[in-house]
Amino acid sequence: MCDFTEDQTAEFKEAFQLFDRTGDGKILYSQCGDVMRALGQNPTNAEVLKVLGNPKSDEMNVKVLDFEHFLPMLQTVAKNKDQGTYEDYVEGLRVFDKEGNGTVMGAEIRHVLVTLGEKMTEEEVEMLVAGHEDSNGCINYEAFVRHILSG
């Protein structure tokens, strides 16, 4: 069922164990998406919930899973090719480039990230845009997307 190599699986298990706060070889359901993202995947919150079997929100910080159950979920997410590409993200941000100079206002990016789609918190957005704004409050969106996709 699993298409990962032995080396990949060992690397994934090592990362999984970093999220194991109690040392029992398990992580909380609420950590599953973070582990997947740490391993280079980019699932939406909805995708994570789907592979977890759509648990109730109050179960997310109670239910746990071990690596043997996590790995097939990671495989499912890795096979999903509906993830956006560099070009997709740049094209999406180009809509906000009113002057056609390759930059967008940082305030606009902040607004979009906290209000649309999978909403981020203001703290998450600040961490994401930190160091990308120029003296005019503009962000070069191509460099911004490259930075985000590079992990």
UniProtKB/Swiss-Prot annotation:
PROSITE patterns: EF_HAND_2
BP GO terms, sorted: muscle contraction; muscle filament sliding; skeletal muscle tissue development
Keywords: Acetylation, Motor protein, Muscle protein, Myosin, Phosphoprotein, Repeat
Positions of modified residues (N6-acetyllysine): K81
Modified residues (N-acetylcysteine): C2
GO MF annotation terms: calcium ion binding; cytoskeletal motor activity; microfilament motor activity; structural constituent of muscle
Limits of the EF-hand domain: 7-42, 84-119, 119-151
PTM annotation (Phosphoserine): residues: S57
Superkingdom to which the source organism belongs: Eukaryota
Record-annotated disulphide pairs: none
InterPro entries: CALM/Myosin/TropC-like, EF-hand-dom_pair, EF_hand_dom
Coiled-coil annotated residue ranges, if any: none
Cellular compartments per GO CC: brush border; cytosol; extracellular exosome; membrane; myosin complex; myosin II complex; unconventional myosin complex; vesicle
Description of how the protein assembles with itself and partners: Myosin is a hexamer of 2 heavy chains and 4 light chains. Interacts with SPATA6.
Function: Regulatory light chain of myosin. Does not bind calcium.
Name of the protein in its database record: Myosin light polypeptide 6
Gene: MYL6
